[in-house]
């Protein structure tokens, strides 16, 4: 509905994550005015080492004012679960300046898939004067080709600064040596 109302709707999906989704599904979205791109399409027989360079981000930005980020996939089975697979996940709603960082992460990925550099100020509206809090938020991203281990460095810093406790939860616990050292 929103694309038909003139709202700019952009979608990046991971080609491997949507392996079983037929191309016609995305074509119908494009026909409805949604700008849709696959992140690093995998085509056979060109199966290379880059097949594992996937986009695992789950984020959404609305009008540059509200952002959602976390672990929830967009599919009914992740909302309702089923008898064989129940899901527990965390997703955050963010308002204020932190939304700019979520949007920046999306627009960097957008440049990667579309080669369109989106820099217009309309995408970064002024933060509402009604948002008053003392919260700090930092959005940290990673990439398999980035020389900067930002997330790992963030974990190390958090662990080293802890004074009373640290809670960590992850489905994939494959820590680097610096993270293990900091945990000890």
Regions flagged by a language model, labelled:
Residues 1-184:
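Charged, low-complexity intrinsically disordered terminal segments
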């Amino acid at each position: 509905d929103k694309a038909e109302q003139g709202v700019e709707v952009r979608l990046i999906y991971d080609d491997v994550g949507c392996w079983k989704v037929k191309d016609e599904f995305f074509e119908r979205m494009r026909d409805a005015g949604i700008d849709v791109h696959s992140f690093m399409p995998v085509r056979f027989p060109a199966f290379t080492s880059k097949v594992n360079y996937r986009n695992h981000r789950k984020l959404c930005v609305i009008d540059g004012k509200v952002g959602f980020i976390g672990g929830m996939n967009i599919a009914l089975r992740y909302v309702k679960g089923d008898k064989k697979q129940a899901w527990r996940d965390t997703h955050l709603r963010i308002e204020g300046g932190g939304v700019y960082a979520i949007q920046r992460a999306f627009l960097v990925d957008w440049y990667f898939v579309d080669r369109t550099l989106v820099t217009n100020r309309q995408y970064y509206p002024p933060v509402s004067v009604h948002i008053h809090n003392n919260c700090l938020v930092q959005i940290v991203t990673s990439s398999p080709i980035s020389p900067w281990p930002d997330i790992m460095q963030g974990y190390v810093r958090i662990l080293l600064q802890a004074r009373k406790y640290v809670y960590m939860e992850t489905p994939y616990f494959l820590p680097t040596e610096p993270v293990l050292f900091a945990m000890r």
